[in-house]
Design a protein with these regions (language model features):
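Charge-dense, helix-prone N-terminal extensions
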Residues: 1-104
Length: 104
């Protein structure tokens, strides 16, 4: 099932105080970037983020989900209605997000 544009827009609004949030549509889902680094994505209208150490430390009740068959587990963020929580979460994880690989 593809994610809705409405859910994407809602998440982007919730993250509006975080500078550098962008997204890319991919096969009916959305990859979320934070200052050029992949932070997570929206899959089946669920916000999932990379399971980096700072995210594991920040999220109190971790629930891992697979975004799609064959993918690595990611952390499901259930508190999408809490703008302050999402803002602080994304700011907390930035330094642990992998930097993009240089294209050859």
């Amino acid at each position: 099932m593809a994610s809705s544009k409405e859910f994407l827009e809602y998440i982007l609004e919730q993250l509006s105080e975080v500078e550098g949030i962008t997204y890319r549509a991919m096969m009916g889902e959305y990859i979320i970037y934070y200052k050029g680094r992949i932070a997570g994505g929206i899959y089946d209208d669920r916000l999932l983020i990379k399971p980096v150490k700072s995210a594991i430390d920040y999220v109190s009740d971790i629930r891992y989900e697979v975004p799609y068959e064959g993918a690595k587990e990611m952390i499901l963020i259930e508190e999408v209605d809490n703008k302050e929580y999402l803002t602080e979460l994304f700011k907390a994880i930035y330094d642990d997000l992998p930097t993009p690989k240089k294209k050859k």
